[in-house]
Amino acid sequence: MSSTSNENISSYVIFKSKGQHINTSYNPIDIHPIHPWIVYADSDSNIVIQNYQNNEKILNFSISQHDEEKKEQILLLQKKVPTLSALSSSASGINGTNNNNSGSNSSNNNNNNNGSLSNSPNNNNNVAFIGSTGGVDSRSASVTSIGSGGGVVTPINVNSNSNSNSPSVPTLHVIGNQTLHNRSPNNTIKLSPNSSNNDSLNNNNNNINNNSTNSNNYLNENLDKMKLGQIKFIYFYDKHTRSCKDKKPKISQNKLQNISKAQPSVGIEDYIVVVAENRIVFINYHSQRLREVKIPAFENKSPNSVEFFSNSPFVAFGGPDSMIRLWNTEKWEIEKQLAGHPKGTIVKLKAIEIEGEFLVSGGTDGFVCVWNVKTGSLATQFSKVHEIVDLSYDYVTGQVMALTQDRHIMIYDLNTLKEVSKVSCGKKEFFSIEAYYHSRFNQDLLLGMKQPAQVSFFSRSGSTKEYSIDLDALLNPSKKEKSKLYKVVQHPLQPHLLLCWLNKSVYIVSTLATSIPMQVTTFNSLSNDHTVYYPFAGYLYSSSLTNVLTCEKVQTPIQLSLNENYKLDISPSGKYLSIHAISSGNYQILEISTWKILEKGQALDVAWSGKGKDSTVDEKFGKLEKILESVDSVKKKKTLGILPSIVKSTKKEETVISKILLKTKEFNNNNVVQELLLHANEDRISGGLMLGVYHKESTNSNGTLNYGSGGSIGSGSGSGTISSGSSNLINGSVGGSSSNNSANSNNSNNNNNNNNNNSNNSNNNNNSSQPILEPPIITTGEETESKSFQLLDWWTLQPVGESLPPPLKIYWDQNQTHCAIAFTHYFFVFKLRPTFHMLCRWSLGITSAVWHNNTLFFSTHNDIQCIFPHKHESSPIILASSTGNVFPEDLYDLSSGSLSTSKPNQSFSTLPNIKPTGPISLIEVNNEGLVLLDSNYKFYCIPLTHYLLKFFILAQMEAIDLAMKCSTMVDPKYHYLMAKFLTVRGHPKECLQMNGISNFLKLQICLNNEAFETSLDIVPLITEAIKSGQSITNENNNDEEVTLSSMGKMCIEIGQRAQNKNEYPTAEKAFKLATSLEPNSAYQELALHYVFLKKMNELKELQQSISTTYPLESNLISLFLD
């Protein structure tokens, strides 16, 4: 393993199957595109659906147990309904009885009572006929008739005179011991030759006793044929998987309108497809009902591959006979057979849905064929190569990639139907290939290798080096047992999630923190425009955000290596740009106006401060440097210096202790520098309004990994270690960060003697021909287990607050009022003024975020949302999702003003409501909308012109007057949400202007937010409506009728609550208002109110005014006065 990378990757294990011994013969496993589910088959062939976020098993289904229950039902039914064997045995018993007791009717009667056949005087061969109609022949006496449907007909007793001289009845034998469910199609019965009476009598009891056993044996033989065998493939097949496979260009507006179509009921088409050695089963994971796929060609040999289509009911099976069979899941029959593939087992199928449905197949014969599914014909066939191991289709480029047995990757273009390129895999033997887009890796192919267990990234152009993740070092650092990677599955919508079948366990490994595209934005005062800078194709590019969909990518003179991953950061003033190379540690600071290099060097990490009072002066630049302190045990000398790129130990007795030095300086004419010596484990920082320092905790246990910069890192107290059982979460900012893995790579390869010159010179890094490997990282994904992140003040370098769990990213508001701290599965929103305190917590894992006027726009795995942080949570706005569902539903309707002044999101790939596939980065909010960037560095713009969204943003900015003007354009059905939004922010009076909510609901909103004065202004409006006979809507409780008396009681409640809040004038107003609605109780409360405030004059006036009309309350007041 090469240790040239100094990067501490942000990969972490978010799921691991615990205590399970999973069969690895075929590795059946799949991951759901929408729900956090995986499905796999355990060692007992049970189908397990498990939630990989909380480890909860949602389904544990046993097909074999289902078959056993079916067998028991058949046997139970068999006991109730006699079989033909039982009839034959009873018939032979009658023969013996008749011969030995001729003329005796009692024996015949007893046998008839037991359901046996009696002798007819006119027929020597009595046979029970069991036909499709279930009728009973007149020649049989007391026979239970069985229809084809399994129904039982009441026995019919026929009285007949037995003839003692009649010949013996031949014995009945059923072919193959046929039973109710295992009968020949024509229901034929074979008659044996006439046997002797004595033999029949001797064998009568044996036939009766063995009857049930023979039937059971036959049933077991047939059920053995139905045994599942080992499970080869398992897939989710429901409406979500079909929707995610639909990646055709959505250029029609009708595509958006079709989203509102009624979806099928839950569970109707939600299947798990199980392909085993002996059977193909569709399991409805809601009802747990099974449906068998009966294909005669697969009775002896099961299919080798399965593929699905998004908008057709076909499932394609690649068989061992070079045939492809299309199974129609609606008709439940074979729709077509695609013949013409040369001899050889078809190992892989891929569905291609462009303009029509096409299917690509590849086999051991070395041919790659393209089929037209609609016509069933062979569209094209590429030249023969070596045996095809795996296939992949890239819907972005329209290319087909074929992995061959001779360690090559064949790339075909379906537009030109020609071979594009041929990439060599070197000496590595891979078993799988997938198209891959990940901003962290410049490569665009994902390959899996069994042993050593590695996931490798290749480039189709061959211009970049191979980049590999060593899963054996990542998940098994003890090196006691080498791991084997049997299968790797890429998440359909989240390419940073890799589902790995490693040894006998299932892992989900994520590189989420570094998967989103790297970019920075700044405001150009000269052009009055925001500009975004990003690495692309070996150079630093810039684009204007004003016309982001039409502007050209401007190439700057700054050249970047294709083999590097960079972290970009910009100064608060927007004048300076820092570029930090993750692997080599080189950094440079550029002046954007001239692209002049102001400073360069080496550092573990760099960061900029947030905006100060004067952004041109109060901006600071910070960097981390690793220093070493070497101690010679003989000379007792200490030396201190910057750690060079290559450290070679010349004396065995030397001990090297590594330390971290934090340097910050004001980036102006003064260049005042501050230094802070940190612990050896602190090797990463984050910028913003406050300086964040990451610290990796050390544990002393077996299998520890020493973190250093190569050379002889001793066991001194300064060396950082992390064990295989460490609970620390290694996090990273966008684009990755920090370097702590050189010694990791060094130690992980000591046993293999591959550690010479592990810490290669960073200047020679790009020229190295060896592949770059991921360092071994052991993580758990649980941030609560470790508080290893500390915020510091930029100017004093003193800690601010307590230590926090290490976040993935901190998003600071430009107005310095809010910040969002993102963790793996949740994020916090903090308010910075007047004190640093938490506002809210959301259980969502965000991948990117941007602030705009106190509104947070963020992206998750499946959608793009915006929230309006407040101590009282409000409903988020869903701007786009992978399924196309948004909120509000009319977000992009013309009537709501959404598309009236804005351009479409993308004319080629998606409409505004559909989130681009894969990780995205939110860049900026401007006049055109929300600008975002995908992993291919393609720009998108989501319009933000819906009036409800504008209202929320204006209200969040405290621009209430503008928000109320905008509210008049919003559909009244959203007025309730708007009123709630206003009242929790202290503006209940503005709710009175909204016509979409009733006065009673306005009153409830004011009461819930303790706006008592405003609520009393609404009471007269409601009472007037009641007096005039108008209907009063009670949205909270439709069963409760709103009357004058109930309004009076509500006014009394308002007065009491106002008293508790010391709002005495409001309380007095409420009690006085209640005297006209509920006078008895209101006068008492008003009198008590005056007594409490010692207003005796007002109390006397009240007594005099009610002395005649309400004498009881007047007497009570007299007691108060006395």
Curated annotation (Swiss-Prot):
Stretches with biased composition (Low complexity): 88-126, 191-215
UniProt organism field: Dictyostelium discoideum
Quaternary organization: Component of the TSET complex, a heterohexamer composed of tstA, tstB, tstC, tstD, tstE and tstF, which may act in plasma membrane turnover. tstA, tstB, tstC and tstD are likely to be the core complex members with tstE and tstF acting as associated scaffold proteins.
Source species taxonomy: Eukaryota, Amoebozoa, Evosea, Eumycetozoa, Dictyostelia
Each WD repeat, start to end: 298-337, 342-381, 383-422
Keyword Repeat (UniProt): yes
Keywords tagged on the record: Repeat, WD repeat
Region (Disordered): 88-131, 178-215, 731-775
Biased composition (Polar residues): 178-190
Gene behind the chain: tstF
Top-level taxon in the UniProt lineage: Eukaryota
Signal sequence, renumbered to the chain: none
Name of protein: TSET complex member tstF
